[in-house]
């Protein structure tokens, strides 16, 4: 009885967080409910796994979303739309053979579904494209990247030697973690290129622009003055 009450409490909290769009906190509550649900309650475990999967998908936690979708499928609680989401997660994660297998099942069940048909083509062609390589040379810029989210870069300056971007790295203002993403709120950072072409370590913009709340993608006027 106590275990059942604990499960219900986590589920109610999870649903509340979910209604607020706080997917990270919702996933955490659903995970605790899933862990406490006995293995013999297959239907309940499958339903909770599905809730977890959808939350993880929202916050771009692809490997966790895949694992949760697999459990939902294993417990026969995933609809065709859920299996489509699972197949697309596999494709996104580079698991092309497994994605192709899932998309084939979906095309057989939903022959008119454009997403399923396009997904199957993508899963078949992606390994070929990957093997052929790209005309572009891409390399990781360690000076810009952190272990958190770094996004929305904007170049500024006559020589485009100033790079502004948003980051949720540890140096961002505030101490609280977002219930949506599980990371700190985003701040705007700046890196500058010197005369030797070397970029500086990014630093948070001063002057009171950054706060403990989210400072999203920045933008500039065409003349770069504002």
How would you label these PLM feature ranges?
Residues 32-35, 71-74, 107-108:
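Conserved structural position within tetratricopeptide repeats
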Residues 20, 58, 82-85, 92-226:
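Short, conserved micro-motifs composed of acidic
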Residues 3-22, 37:
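Bacterial Sec signal peptide processing site at the extreme N-terminus
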